[in-house]
Amino acid sequence: MTETNKKIFISAGESSGDIHGANLMRCLLERNPNVTFYGLGKENMRQAGLHSLHDMSKKSLMWLHALTEISTFWKIKKECVSFFRRERPGVVILIDYCGFNFHLARAAKKLGIPVVYYVCPQIWAHGPWRVKKMKKLVDKVIVIYPFEKSFYDKAGVPSVYAGHPLFDEIS
């Protein structure tokens, strides 16, 4: 993200991602109060300052529910890609839910927009072969478990260990 482009696109599909996204937004705003957030989230992210492209509060991005609304999610993806083309955000931050967010990552990469994945999908447990896809689609991952950093480093995916957001809230 450049000094002149302070637009951040951020996408969280599930309620837990919405909480993590809101916390991340607050942290980024503390560092730079001139940043503006656009994207997909729910109530927590809207309260933290998200300019929502689509009301996701009644949408479920969990696997079985998402299948029943596939045409809706296709339209939402198209809205996001139009936003990428029109507004050219400085960075796209994706939170969990690779089933939808990988599509956004692919579109952003094609347009030359940097992609950061925060709270990565647990591909180390549910399909380690997908790390190749992650390497192609993202510029950096921000991981929450210490072992994830070495997993991504070995695969050649630039990574930063941030710690688990829940542990920060507890301590």
Q: For the regions a protein language model found, what residue spans apply to each?
A:
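Active-site and donor-binding regions of nucleotide-sugar-utilizing enzymes
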Residues: K6-S171
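Short, flexible hinge/linker loops that cap or flank conserved catalytic cores
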Residues: M1-E3
